[in-house]
Regions:
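Primarily extracytoplasmic ectodomains and periplasmic/lumenal surface modules that are beta-strand-rich
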Residues: 13-15, 44-46, 105-106
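A generic structural signal for short, non-catalytic loop/turn and secondary-structure boundary residues
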Residues: 1, 48-50, 90
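N-terminal, Lys/Arg- and Ser/Thr-rich interaction peptides
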Residues: 1-20
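N-terminal amphipathic/basic helix or basic patch
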Residues: 1, 30-34, 108
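Generic beta-strand structural signal
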Residues: 4, 53-55, 93-95
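Internal, well-folded beta-alpha domain core
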Residues: 64-221
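Short, structured patches in soluble enzyme cores that scaffold and shape functional sites
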Residues: 8-10, 59-61, 99-101
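Glycine/small-residue-rich interface belts in oligomeric ring/scaffold proteins
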Residues: 18-78
Length: 221
């Protein structure tokens, strides 16, 4: 299995929290399900197809602001109403994403990004992504006692005791009776420069930590 590393930039982004209606609150980083969805779009996956993968998400943003958008709501077949909604957005987002998958999957993601002509989004359809860096890692090692250098989601299986903001994030789903049943993972959102450290963690050849959401790639790979 290979690991692909991407450095992404977004001028603005809203990674909307579930069930936020009157106010569209955003996560501080994209949840795993959003990142997995982006990769499946890059892979041109057919409806219902799933490529097993493991994801690490970290990054920083310059600030947060809000604006009003018109929310359309459908009641029944014919009735449509609208209301203004406050949308929280992140400004100048820089992300580091690591994805681990079968060699063929990683090679296809890399090829489709490097040779692709389409624009990519992460979050809403209007949240465009600029890819500032992409490479398949050659050297990943386990290191000890590492500080948090970049804001990150740190899964519970890596460190239960670390201080941070608790989130229960969607990862993948199964459809039961036409309803998506999400698998979830408990994480802490930990900010840089908080004097928090992790005893053992994976680190790539550039010195960036890797916080995969699962000990093993889902589906047993």
């Amino acid at each position: 299995m290979k690991i692909l590393k991407l450095k992404l930039y977004q001028e603005t982004a809203c990674y909307k929290k579930p069930f936020a209606t009157k106010v569209a609150e955003t996560y501080p980083l994209p949840p795993y399900s959003t990142v997995i969805g982006m990769f499946h779009k890059i892979l041109q996956a057919q409806p219902g197809a799933y490529f097993p993968m493991n994801i690490s998400v970290q990054g920083n943003y310059e600030g947060i602001f809000s604006n009003y958008q018109n929310l359309r709501m459908y009641k029944g077949k014919d009735k449509v109403t609208s209301m203004p909604r406050n949308v929280h957005q992140l400004l100048n987002v820089n992300l580091i994403i690591h994805v681990q998958a079968e060699d063929e999957t990683i090679d296809k993601i890399y090829k489709n990004i490097v040779n692709g002509t389409e624009t990519f989004t992460l979050g809403r359809n209007e949240d465009l992504v600029r890819i500032n860096g992409i490479k398949i890692l050659k050297d990943v090692k386990e290191v000890e006692d590492q500080n948090i250098k970049i804001n990150a989601y740190i899964p519970e299986w890596i460190d239960k005791e670390i201080n941070g903001i608790n989130y229960r994030l969607n990862t993948t789903y199964k459809i039961k009776e036409d309803i998506r049943q999400w698998d979830k993972v408990n994480v802490k959102y930990v900010e840089k420069y908080t004097n928090e450290s992790i005893e053992e963690i994976l680190q790539d050849e550039d010195g960036d930590n890797i916080y995969f959401y699962s000990e093993r790639i889902p589906n047993g790979l």
